Structures are given as structure tokens and as C-alpha cells.
Design a protein with these regions (language model features):
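Nucleic-acid endonuclease domains
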Residues: 1-71, 79, 89-256
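Active-site beta-strand-loop-beta-strand hairpin of nuclease catalytic cores
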Residues: 75-84
Length: 256
């Protein structure tokens, strides 16, 4: 299936227009559409599927928006290849946490599914859109009591199958590792500069000034030992972060 950033952005613009009209209707009748974003997102789910289908028709041979029980939200056909796409619309919780969910029974029955997750802010102005390819039950947590068959995504495995089309998804572990690596480089550079200076002082020092030479040599040894200890400690930190479960943050993109 062909899913482009431009197609997704066009669908978002149409969704925003529909949202504005719906919000106007609510306001005119003394209600606030954004008071309950969960209900708002339910109302916006069909426009999401409809508008994405409309845009995908420009880059695929055949695109059908069905969405009936037991049917995929969108079916995309190119040549003899027919692919299914599940679409989900969600928003951050009041705590800021973002939970991407799926229906366990559908996922278990299909074996593997592609997903489009539209994540909208409360005002429906900024978004993150992610296309996940070939997700399985292993990419989601187990069914919890009271979850009504819904399962939460495990970012640690699912993000390796993700293509972020709108906004950004950042792995905080990558950022931590980058900063540690920069510290290692800086530590090495400072040590090399200091060792160059000490080596020059040693070369310029008279052979007869034994105590002075011994002192410089001692400083060289101390510099090497101290640097290696610092680098070793940083490498341990780097390994610790590498072995930790990744944590992800979402950066929303304003759609005009």
C-alpha cells in the first residue's frame, strides 16, 4: 500500500474543517465538543477514515472504506495485492500519557495488521500520525480485566515497525546515549589536549631537572588514569541505557 505524508496531511486538513463545523454546531446548542475528547474522537473516527480513503485513492489503484463489523476500516488494492488498514484516532490523557490500543480478537484472528494511528491534541490543531506495518499480538500487552478486549501497544517492540508521517516520535534512550557519547568525546579531547601540553613540557625540560621531569611524568600518568576511569564510568552508563526499555515521547505538528 502507498501511504504518503501529503495524503495524510490533506486528510487532516479536511478533518479539521469538519471538526470546526461540528464544534460550531455544539457551541450553537450550548455544548463544548472538546470537553470530552474521548467522545469527540468517536465522532471524528468516521471522518478520519473517509478523508484518508479519499486521499489514498490518488496514490493507489483501489481504496474502499468499509468499517463494518468483521471488516477492515480501509481495504487497499494494487494489482492482485489486497491489503487491510485499521485506523485509530486517540488523544493524550489528562496526565499527558498516550495509549495506542487495538482490539485483541481482531488482531489474533488476522495474525498481522497494518495500523494508522492519528493522535490529536485537545483542540484538534496539532497531530502525530504513525503508520505501523505488520503488527501482531506480540506488539501488544495481554488483555486486562475490564478492558473489554482492548490491548495496549508495547512501544518497545512496535516502534521498530513504525513510519512517522506527521509530527515526531523520540526515543529518550537515544537522546541519553547521544549525550553520554558526547561526554566521552569531550573527555578524550580534553585529555589529549592536556597530554599534548605535558608532553611538550617534558620535551622542553632539561635532562638535569630530574625532579621536574618526574613531576611531569607523574602528571601524564595521572591524566591517562583519570581519563580512562572517567571514560569507563561513562561507558557503563551508556551500556545501562542501552539495556533499559526504551521510553518514547511524541512531538505534535501544527497542521494549517
Amino acid at each position: 500500500m502507498n501511504i504518503t505524508k501529503s495524503a495524510v496531511i490533506s486528510s487532516l486538513r479536511d478533518m479539521k474543517n469538519f471538526h470546526d463545523q461540528l464544534q460550531g454546531l455544539y457551541t450553537a446548542n450550548g455544548m463544548d465538543l472538546t470537553q470530552d475528547v474521548g467522545r469527540r474522537n468517536i465522532l471524528m473516527s468516521l471522518p478520519m477514515e473517509h478523508n484518508l480513503t479519499k486521499e489514498l485513492k490518488f496514490v493507489n489503484e483501489k481504496v474502499v472504506n468499509d468499517g463494518r463489523t468483521g471488516k477492515a476500516d480501509i481495504i487497499i488494492t494494487n494489482g492482485e495485492i489486497e491489503e487491510e488498514l485499521e485506523c485509530k484516532l486517540t488523544s493524550p490523557h489528562k496526565s499527558g500519557a498516550i495509549s495506542l490500543q487495538s482490539d485483541f480478537d481482531t488482531l489474533e484472528r488476522k495474525g498481522s495488521l497494518d495500523y494508522m494511528y492519528y493522535i490529536a491534541d485537545r483542540k484538534f490543531e496539532k497531530f502525530v500520525v504513525i503508520h505501523f506495518k505488520g503488527l501482531t499480538v506480540d506488539d501488544f500487552r495481554s488483555v486486562s480485566p475490564g478492558s473489554r478486549g482492548k490491548v495496549q501497544m508495547k512501544y518497545s517492540s512496535a516502534m521498530s515497525k513504525a513510519e512517522v508521517l506527521v509530527g515526531k516520535v523520540k526515543n529518550s534512550n537515544h537522546e541519553k546515549k547521544r549525550k553520554i557519547f558526547e561526554k566521552i568525546i569531550l573527555t578524550r579531547r580534553k585529555a589529549n589536549s592536556r597530554l599534548t601540553e605535558l608532553q611538550q613540557r617534558l620535551e622542553e625540560c632539561s635532562e638535569k631537572a630530574e625532579k621536574k621531569r618526574e613531576n611531569i611524568i607523574r602528571m601524564i600518568d595521572n591524566c591517562i588514569n583519570t581519563t580512562e576511569a572517567k571514560v569507563f564510568k561513562l561507558m557503563r552508563q551508556f551500556d545501562d541505557v542501552t539495556n533499559k526499555k526504551p521510553r518514547f515521547s511524541f512531538e505534535f505538528e501544527d497542521i494549517q
